[in-house]
């Protein structure tokens, strides 16, 4: 049996809830390492639960102890949230433990893990197309910044996710006001904003080799274009696949990655914006795309690490995350969207989590709580 340990530090991070199901479909024995109220436990698809707290020192020490006491039991350890990746990346010095626990094989590229400035530096190192950026410091006055960057720009706090910690600044005259709103300026990234087509990508790598992937046109955001998404149209792309193969080998990606590109049609350039070396909420829904991550996991179990060489499929499918999208519809009065859910638009009912009562129940509680907030 192929044994995996799924690890989450952030109990309220709901994107972990369906990940055990994805591994179970691949035939794995699934252990989870998380707090008592974690979404990672809110399913029936894990075999054992190892309890920890969300206190960083306790979490780190318990995880390292668990791994060291079971050195050969787990074939794969998967960190599922940015906070866990950041904590363990900062804590581990041993190259053996680094490769055992963290999702890249090249320890020299560890800066990319849960770090906005780290990603920008890695892009510069390997000549990967990314928007022009600078690492902000108090020594950079407004005139210097305006000379180095073309506005509009984004202000990105170094450790941030789901759109939190990102600001849009349209003009240099507004920059100081934007800077005043930043809560943590350490390694703050100022980056040119590229107007183009946003492309969400999920990918699975093994030892730098691309195993499987999906890319998507973004159809709906929860709040603004820097927040998480609720509707996507999935497809395959030879251009994206080629970029992913290069990225995986250069960085040494070894696991899942949630990636964002923006395509500038006039320049014919795909700019890399985000690489979060972890799973996301969309990956379990790959079973509806024809490019299933559970099948990718099976390939890894079978030792099939060969690159994807077949031409991209022309098949497209629209997918929506039930609770997130319905919450968006209610929050912003999107009655058309609500009606689409009621009428099973494009087979949307497939995406309701009826296969698992535990996660369906917790999802329902969260939706009801949000609805009551909206009413009262």
Stretches with model-predicted labels:
Residues 290-296:
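C-terminal, active-site-flanking charged/polar segments
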Residues 163, 220-223, 276-290:
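Glycine-rich phosphate/pyrophosphate-binding beta-alpha loops
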């Amino acid at each position: 049996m192929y044994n995996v340990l799924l690890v989450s530090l952030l109990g309220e991070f709901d994107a972990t809830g369906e990940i055990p199901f994805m591994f179970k479909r691949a035939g794995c024995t699934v252990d989870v390492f998380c707090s008592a109220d974690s979404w990672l436990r809110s399913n029936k698809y894990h075999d054992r639960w190892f309890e920890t707290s969300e206190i960083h020192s306790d979490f780190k020490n318990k995880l390292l102890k668990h791994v060291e006491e079971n050195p050969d039991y787990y074939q794969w350890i998967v960190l599922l949230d940015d906070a866990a990746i950041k904590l363990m990346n900062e804590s581990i010095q041993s190259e053996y433990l680094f490769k055992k626990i963290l999702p890249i094989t090249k320890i020299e590229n560890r800066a990319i893990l849960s770090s906005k400035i780290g990603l920008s530096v890695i892009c510069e190192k390997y000549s990967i197309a990314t928007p022009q950026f600078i690492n902000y410091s108090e020594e950079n006055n407004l005139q210097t910044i305006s000379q180095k960057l073309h506005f509009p720009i984004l202000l990105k706090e170094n450790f941030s996710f789901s759109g939190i910690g990102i600001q849009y600044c349209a003009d240099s005259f507004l920059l100081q006001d934007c800077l005043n709103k930043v809560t943590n300026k350490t390694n703050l990234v100022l980056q040119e904003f590229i107007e183009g087509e946003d492309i969400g990508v999920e990918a699975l790598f093994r030892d730098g080799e691309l195993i499987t992937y999906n890319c998507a046109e973004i159809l709906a955001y929860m709040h603004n274009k820097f927040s998480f998404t609720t509707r996507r149209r999935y497809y395959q792309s030879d251009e994206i696949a080629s970029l992913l193969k290069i990225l995986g080998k250069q960085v040494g990606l070894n696991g899942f990655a949630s990636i964002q590109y923006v395509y500038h049609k006039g320049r014919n350039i795909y700019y890399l914006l985000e690489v979060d070396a972890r799973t996301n909420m969309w990956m379990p829904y790959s079973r509806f795309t024809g490019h299933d991550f559970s099948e990718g996991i099976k390939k890894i179990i079978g030792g099939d690490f060969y690159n994807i060489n077949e031409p991209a499929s022309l098949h497209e499918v629209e997918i929506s995350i039930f609770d997130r999208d319905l919450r968006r519809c209610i929050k912003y009065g999107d009655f058309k969207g609500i009606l689409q859910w009621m009428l099973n638009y494009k087979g949307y009912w497939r995406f309701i989590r009826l296969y698992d009562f535990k996660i369906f129940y917790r999802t329902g509680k969260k939706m009801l709580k949000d609805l009551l907030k909206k009413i009262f």
